[in-house]
């Protein structure tokens, strides 16, 4: 919570609120649902976006599984206390940020799809290796390697959506993202 609050400070201090549209909440909700239904209906016209959203659903589910069970696995398999699991998670976030920054030039040079493919493949290989190790320091080292690919997989996914979605529908498609 403290982490979130700290990094939200610039949002609260320097981002102005939008003016009230005057539209009643009930009308806004109805219009929003109508737009969502329309976006889903027309998604089939944009096959590349549809295929990407389906593929992303699968590999993001894998990432979410890592995030959800990684701490439990670390605690049970290596006897990590909650403070060490927290430090491991923070270190993973730092390496993910470094990986995202480091791979940004490859996203520009190769495009997002090869970066996503490389990242997801590396995450799978490193993740399997992490399940097999018995030494805590090796687990930590592999975890930091894993983090280097977690950031690019997520950043390149956003880049991919931004590139393949038609400009006029980009915000709607990011709503499905």
Task: Locate each region found by the language model.
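Juxtamembrane intracellular "pre-TM" segments in multi-pass secondary transporters
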Residues: 17-54
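Short amphipathic helix-loop junctions that connect adjacent transmembrane helices
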Residues: 68-85
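Loop-to-transmembrane helix entry/capping segments in MFS-fold secondary transporters
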Residues: 82-83, 167-177
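Helix-to-loop junctions at the C-terminal end of transmembrane segments
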Residues: 98-112
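Intracellular juxtamembrane helix-capping segments at the cytosolic ends
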Residues: 152-166
